Amino acid sequence: EELIRHIKRLRSEKNAVILAHNYQISPVQDIADFTGDSLGLSLEASRTDADMIVFCGVHFMAESAKVLSPNKQVFLPHLGAGCALADAITVESLEEWRERYPDHTVVTYVNSTAEVKAESDICCTSANAVSVVRSLDTDKVLFTPDKNLARWVAKQVPEKEIVAYDAVCPTHDVLRNASVDRTRRDYPEAIIIAHPECREDVVDAAHEVCSTTGMLDAVGRYPDARTFIIATEEGMIHQLKLRYPDKEFVSADGDRKSTRLNSSHSSI
């Protein structure tokens, strides 16, 4: 409690805004001014008059915040909080890939570095990936970096030829339908909601496939359902419980967070 009070005092003194991604641990989410997905948080911060942004997330998220708020100071509480998916592609590997497919348009998922985004034709989020790909004039698409998301998009937009970069989010890719099935045996009436970064077998088993922000809306479409199995980072369950306290949420996997209250305090 003393640490939380100190964080709040420093936030006020330094005119800071604290952002916490939906995947952060609940104590970090609870001290944040805004919680949400990476792009949504960066947009929220850009609309504030804060001088300092403390982004409780990973490196590419802080980069996005800086791009949208170039005149604000942006701090990442844990400098080692990286994203294996974003690290899986570099400008050099993107250029090599592009040379092999010169007639394709590069669509880059927001979970990537600023340098890679800058070399892409268009960027997308997991929430709008389908609509972005569908909107393109071309039928030939290079989708980077997440091949699981690319596969899901390709199913929704079969009229496009989508070539996927060979990278995954380890947190989502580790999930298997077998583990979802085991959880479902304990909760046979549960609604399964999966993130599109999950493997194909998990996505195919889900009732709903959507971004983290989309999950908050998806639960509302099942007013009679009591239990939901959530196939994404466990931190997302905290926001779901806050929005729907009368529902039960069961995680299909574990914890990958590195930001803690101490590191958030140190940033400020």
Predicted features along the sequence, with ranges:
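Active-site loop-to-helix "anion-binding N-cap" substructures in soluble metabolic enzymes
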Residues: 1-230, 236-260
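Single conserved hydrophobic/aromatic residue that forms the stacking wall/gate
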Residues: 261-268
